[in-house]
Amino acid sequence: RTPEDLLKQALRYKPYWKNGGGITVSGGEALLQMDFLIEFFKLAKAEGIHTTIDTAGNPFTREEPFFAKFNELMNLTDLFLLDIKQINDDKHRDLTGFSNSNILDLAQYLSDQGKHMWIRHVLVPTITTDEDDLRKTKEFIDTLKTVDKVEVLPYHKLGITEWERLGIPCLLYTS
């Protein structure tokens, strides 16, 4: 599909959008598709459509060429939905295999640039529910100037059957 095809498809649903509505792009990971999204969001903005990116933030870096493309995409984006899985870097590495430093840097950068964002945090029992970590998450969010909403989401087991179908043990699930 082309950006034009996707916009044409999205516009079919415009009569159902309330209060103006808009387009939210999620993943996989939306920031891995920046070239496509830049073209898609240019078309959407030409139609006056509100644009949102749902991201885990992991690909973010200030290194080129990523950073220039990100800035172009950021300027076409009205709202970012950003997941903060774990504020503690060591625990984040244990949970995801990656540092959270680039995710926290993205949140700070978006705030510094005046970009609106919603922060989401999933409560996974014994993994992301430590009181000290939750307090530090709140303290970090309090430093951000453009957070419009914080969503604390309960962990659910809806993906378990997919893990089982793929023959991969889901380490987050205990019966």
Predicted regions and their residues:
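Short, flexible, mixed-charge acidic loops at enzyme active sites
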Residues: T161-P169
